[in-house]
Amino acid sequence: MFRSVATRLSACRGLASNAARKSLTIGLIPGDGIGKEVIPAGKQVLENLNSKHGLSFNFIDLYAGFQTFQETGKALPDETVKVLKEQCQGALFGAVQSPTTKVEGYSSPIVALRREMGLFANVRPVKSVEGEKGKPIDMVIVRENTEDLYIKIEKTYIDKATGTRVADATKRISEIATRRIATIALDIALKRLQTRGQATLTVTHKSNVLSQSDGLFREICKEVYESNKDKYGQIKYNEQIVDSMVYRLFREPQCFDVIVAPNLYGDILSDGAAALVGSLGVVPSANVGPEIVIGEPCHGSAPDIAGKGIANPIATIRSTALMLEFLGHNEAAQDIYKAVDANLREGSIKTPDLGGKASTQQVVDDVLSRL
């Protein structure tokens, strides 16, 4: 589904040639903590695809994260960005550690990576496993990935009137970025309409308070929809204030189909939505840009379990499939999704976060056996 979306977007034309490629160069960026344990899972799955799908992969080990910062002075080395830009069609990014106290010179490498690579959209499917008890959940959260408060323009100063510290942060919403993210969200909704017979786009904002910034986001999303009624007219268009969105998301998640949100709200909503389908350890995402797709599991570096061999690899394996889908290899992606769903639905081989006792590698082996 997602590959056909990407090829229709002018911003993603550079991805179009990858559908014909049988040999792909994939960057592997484990990062910190359990990232070092789950990224090898994605690599093993890709290596397994050659016999059936005729795909071959060249893997390049790359570095980013807090440990890299401690060793080199840079959380995102120039060489990592250079290799991704010049050699890779896709990449897998694990997780990064966030220090509990301020560390001079350190900032999140994934935020910088999204900016450097032009990864304007974070696409996160949130779906319950078929056959589970309860009403099925099946939504896609599309998050603008390059601006909002995450542009990291901040300052701290002393208020002259009180003599106390004040911190300010700039929130940026641009017409260009909003138009781009609204288009990809509507195109995803359009594909779901074609495969399901109905689709709804929900635009999330806080324009009742932030009338200029969120007001612009709301305005441009509506404009993209209204000015392309010949294309999107059968998609139902809704808006939801972000605080009531949180309430409805957890009370009635089945009401949502495709959600589009500015960076901060999308970050919060998509992590929260993972609780609806079991764990952050099972939810994938893809960072999509003009020339490259980077799969990224939704969980963090989990220092409490790092090194124990019990991290859940499912989110990374699904992110690997999502990356392939955007790169035009839908059949291979679907095989991975089916193998993962079979593991979750039928198997007892699950990591502790899902109530099991299996190791990371045991789960990987079970998924591979189902491929």
UniProtKB/Swiss-Prot annotation:
(2R,3S)-homoisocitrate binds at residues 98, 114, 124, 143, 150, 206, 208. The keyword Secreted does not apply. GO terms for biological process: lysine biosynthetic process; lysine biosynthetic process via aminoadipic acid. GO terms for cellular component: mitochondrion. It is found in: Mitochondrion. Pathway: Amino-acid biosynthesis; L-lysine biosynthesis via AAA pathway; L-alpha-aminoadipate from 2-oxoglutarate: step 4/5. Induction: Activity is repressed 4-fold by lysine. Residues 1-22 form a transit peptide. InterPro entries: IsoCit/isopropylmalate_DH_CS, IsoPropMal-DH-like_dom. It holds the Pfam family Iso_dh. The record marks 150, 206 as: Critical for catalysis. Keywords: Amino-acid biosynthesis, Lysine biosynthesis, Magnesium, Metal-binding, Mitochondrion, NAD, Oxidoreductase, Phosphoprotein, Transit peptide. Catalyzes the NAD(+)-dependent conversion of homoisocitrate to alpha-ketoadipate. Present with 19079 molecules/cell in log phase SD medium. Belongs to the isocitrate and isopropylmalate dehydrogenases family. This is Homoisocitrate dehydrogenase, mitochondrial. It comes from Saccharomyces cerevisiae (strain ATCC 204508 / S288c) (Baker's yeast).
